[in-house]
Amino acid sequence: MTHFKASYSEHFHDQDYVEKVIHQWQTDSQLFVLSTSGSTEKPKKIQLSRNMLIWSAEKTYAALGLQKKQNQLSVLCCLPVQKTGGFMQLIRALHFNWHIHFIPATANP
């Protein structure tokens, strides 16, 4: 069995946020708070249940055609971790015990 691991580039500045989410996950928190992007109105906080996050992680895993026999994956997170895309990369790494390496997002799409 492999274990989750997070690593960070020297210019990544959201390590405190990542560590907070890791702690929540590892202590079996059932609710997680994320801010919406604010693309259609003012950003707001939303609550996401652990079960919903696991469901999403499992569906993404299946959609990408990953095999359960793979005992370790490493992923690079270059998305803002406080937004949905980067946050879900972190959740998938936690759920599947992957190694995730964070670098700062350098562009805003």
Predicted regions, residues:
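Short, charge-rich binding segments
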Residues: 38, 62-71, 82-83, 91-94
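Conserved ATP-dependent adenylate/AMP-binding module captured primarily in the ANL superfamily
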Residues: 1-14, 54-76, 107-109
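Short coil/turn segments at secondary-structure boundaries
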Residues: 44-48, 61, 65, 77-81
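Conserved pre-ATP/AMP-binding loop-to-beta segment of ANL
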Residues: 17-35, 68-73
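Glycine/alanine-rich phosphate-binding loops at beta-alpha junctions
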Residues: 6-16, 20, 39, 43
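AMP-binding/adenylate-forming
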Residues: 50-55, 74-109
